[in-house]
Amino acid sequence: MANTQLQLSPTNTNSRQKFTVSFWLKRGKINSEQCVWTTRLDSGNNTLFKFNANDTFTFKCNKSNADALVLTSNALFRDASGWYNVVIAVDTTQSTDTNRVKIYINGVQETSFGTATYPSQNLSLEINESGNQVWYIGSESSQNYFDGSMSYFAFVSETQEAPTVFGSTDSTTGEWQIKTSITPSVAFGTNGFLILKDGSSLTDQSSNSNNFSL
């Protein structure tokens, strides 16, 4: 996907306080800034997940040109041969700030961050809104393209889900493995989607018909 991005403009506004994003990826290049996905109104209002040039990751939300959320890992992600499953589970209504955003890598929650700015309680993030807001998968709006492969990119638009919705631990090897049948605890939500389920198909497999374009 080194020069490719997928794009969708939501037609509905759902909860901007509760959502879960899950995807599987294999990095094709390290030591470079690469955006995996962003939901973007403009440069000062967006939410994104990216790998940094030092191979940490950052999940952040920018509102009115100010950082409302920034989580940058201490851990480095330099394995270009294996797959990572990333699950980002958000519920800003939670009273405890560290429960408002939970990030799991291969089923294990990341708790060590070099930068940790959690969103204020009940904050509406820059996501899940109709109008001029656009989803970009594989880039930061035509820049900082992701170099690698992706599979099973899922968005659950109204609930904070556990990583076990998207993967499970192999009882023999102990490795985190993909669940090919994804069943959210409630539903995908109106803006929810599941793409790249079978090869490179951009057709939404969640029954919502939220299909992406290339």
Please provide the spans of the model-predicted regions.
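Beta-strand-rich, repetitive solenoid scaffolds
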Residues: Q7-S9, T38-R40, L48-N52, T58-N62, ...
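Short tryptophan-centered beta-strand motifs in secreted/extracellular beta-sheet-rich domains
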Residues: F23, S81-T92, I103
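Extracellular glycan-interaction patches encoded by glycine-rich segments
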Residues: L125-M150
